[in-house]
Amino acid sequence: MSETMIHVEVVYALPQKQRLIGLDVPDGTSMLDAAKLSGIGEQFADLDLDKAPMGVFGKVVANPAGHILKPGERVEIYRPLTADPKLNRKRRAKEKASAGKASN
């Protein structure tokens, strides 16, 4: 008797390079295992799948090794923030204030 397979997608994106890989995995496969089976870790030198945060359709999953995928789910591998969001907001507010003063 053959294993039941499900179709899932694994995605990862950098500003200059993005990958979406569709693959069939055995029913009962974890999010982490699907990411490893996709081979995406070999396409991005700095990507450590064991440590990378992951989610499904925009929702972070705390334990990718324990999340069993459902048919059609998309595993999203997130990269770390390159800038502090608070500092970015402050910078934008300061620029907006400066632009307002310049127009007066």
Curated annotation (Swiss-Prot):
Annotated spans, Disordered: 80-104
InterPro entries membership: Mopterin_synth/thiamin_S_b (IPR016155), RnfH (IPR005346), RnfH_sf (IPR037021)
Family indicated by similarity: Belongs to the UPF0125 (RnfH) family.
PANTHER family given in the database record: UPF0125 PROTEIN RATB (PTHR37483:SF1)
Name under which the protein is recorded: Protein RnfH
Originating species: Alcanivorax borkumensis (strain ATCC 700651 / DSM 11573 / NCIMB 13689 / SK2)
